């Protein structure tokens, strides 16, 4: 059988129905590609307690997707390790990492795939991501979290001057997000890249459990001398926070309990420290690192203190 052109990897944890909706959107909007085997779909389940694995097995029995694989990761091993499990069984020349709470619109995958095929200097690309209300998800359009960018973001300077090159470096707010252009980093909710590039960087860094891994992924691609591109001319819907439960807008649909949310919040702030140690430790004075880590600890304590059982 001819190898697929694109492997679509969806990592799921406790978001059964959202994942099924995401898969259905692919089957509906790309019926020719999935029926012919040009696109393959790989669903990795991180030991979800909500019956996801069985539901995916049932979906496989009735789907018309020619190549549909279900992978049991064997445990809740995190975002990076879970996606790497999917890579091991992927056969496509290109790979798309897609969050389970994402709905892919018609023509988006085709346009994004065509773009990266014709731009060999681009290592990875994302489309515009919006939530259910059409609100822009800036995570698909970011600068790297340098000490200055991070300070401006958490201090509120970025909100005060959202289009400033000086103060809005993390969100890159001076760029027109309705156009296609280069950015530092895109969101792990939608990342498409050539498999050969992923092989060169060793795929996802498993030192990250949840959060931060997409920034590291993009940073590693930059180190190859390649660009990261954002395509504002095509879009997908990303609900966001469905698995983590840390976003207020999606707390009504998350199945995460208070202990799981605490774990995820801790992983989020730990990821900030990991990224700094890996990429900025030797670029800035030790005193600055101590100051930054103290600030991260304060932010973590505030986030944990704000958690309430609804």
Q: Could you tell me what each predicted segment is?
A:
Residues 1-28, 32-37:
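N-proximal low-complexity "stem/linker" segments adjacent to membrane-targeting elements
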Residues 24-75, 85:
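Acidic donor-binding segment of Leloir-type glycosyltransferases
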Residues 72-90, 111:
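Glycine-rich, basic loop-to-helix element that forms the pyrophosphate-binding segment
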Residues 95:
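Short aromatic/hydrophobic "clamp" motif used to bind/position activated sugar donors
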Residues 103-141:
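Conserved donor NDP-sugar-binding/catalytic core segment of glycosyltransferases
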Residues 144-183:
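Short, flexible, basic/aromatic active-site loop/helix in glycosyltransferases
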Residues 176-237:
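A short, conserved alpha-helix in the catalytic core of glycosyltransferases
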Residues 219-309:
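Active-site-adjacent helix/loop segment of glycosyltransferases
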């Amino acid at each position: 059988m001819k190898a697929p052109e694109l492997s679509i990897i969806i990592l799921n944890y406790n978001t059964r129905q959202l994942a099924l909706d995401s898969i259905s959107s692919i089957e509906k909007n790309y019926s020719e590609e999935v029926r012919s085997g040009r696109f393959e779909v790989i669903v990795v389940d991180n030991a979800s307690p909500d019956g996801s694995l069985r539901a995916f097995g049932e979906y496989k029995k009735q789907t018309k997707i020619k190549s549909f694989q279900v992978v049991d990761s064997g445990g809740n091993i995190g975002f990076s390790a879970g996606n790497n499990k999917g890579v091991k069984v992927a056969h496509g020349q290109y790979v798309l990492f897609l969050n389970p709470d994402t709905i892919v619109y018609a023509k988006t995958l085709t346009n994004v795939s065509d773009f990266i095929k014709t731009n060999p200097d681009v290592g990875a690309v994302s489309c515009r991501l919006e939530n259910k209300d059409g609100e822009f998800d800036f995570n698909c359009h970011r600068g790297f979290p340098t000490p200055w960018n991070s300070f401006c973001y958490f201090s509120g300077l970025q909100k005060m001057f959202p289009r400033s090159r000086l103060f809005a470096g993390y969100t890159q707010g001076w760029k027109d997000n309705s156009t296609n252009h280069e950015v530092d980093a895109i969101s792990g909710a939608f990342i498409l890249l050539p498999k050969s590039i992923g092989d060169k960087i060793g795929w996802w860094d498993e030192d990250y459990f949840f959060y931060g891994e997409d920034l590291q992924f993009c940073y590693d691609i930059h180190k190859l001398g390649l660009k990261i591109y954002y395509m504002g001319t095509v879009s997908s819907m990303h609900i966001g926070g469905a698995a983590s439960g840390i976003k207020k807008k999606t707390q009504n649909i998350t199945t995460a309990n208070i202990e799981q949310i605490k774990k995820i919040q801790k992983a989020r702030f730990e990821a900030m420290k990991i990224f700094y140690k890996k990429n900025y430790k030797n670029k800035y004075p030790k005193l600055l690192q101590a100051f930054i880590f103290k600030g991260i600890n304060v932010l973590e304590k505030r986030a944990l203190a704000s958690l309430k059982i609804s």
